[in-house]
């Protein structure tokens, strides 16, 4: 965005010509799982993946340090405050935004997974945990960073922006 602003004095993002650029509070970025897919139907796998995502690093790299962490699939708008208040006990109990790779590893081990010779988590049959993220183009800044975090923790992850992503997601033809 800075390059565009340098070259075009008429260009203006939502927040003006000074960072942060864009609408940082519009809606939280989320990773969605198809819970009917093998491995993703196991809550411990989903929890492990959650623990492998370092949200501070994601914000630093994908959003140039501008953004807010959220553990809920909705922004912290004033009209939703009562909902956030009602969820506070659950958030404290489960800590859904906690970055803790050791906890992720422990959850997978407890669920019967081990790392194979390639360092990828696999079940007793040798089937690896795969998280091929399909996404809309406007998540191209964060998707590859999440993929790298997952790979570093033994999840076989990838990122793509297929032209029919809406159809894939609506039809349940995706994993992550």
Where on the chain are the PLM-derived regions?
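Extracellular/periplasmic solute-recognition and catalytic clefts
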Residues: 1-37, 48, 56, 60-62, ...
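Extracytoplasmic/cell-surface-exposed regions of Actinobacterial cell-envelope-associated
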Residues: 2, 90-99, 144-148, 159-161, ...
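Class I S-adenosyl-L-methionine
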Residues: 5-9, 109, 147, 151
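Structured core elements
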Residues: 32, 132, 156-160
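Append "and occasionally in soluble cytosolic enzymes with long acidic Gly/Pro-rich linkers
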Residues: 41-148
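Short, well-structured beta-strand/strand-turn elements
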Residues: 114-116, 152-167
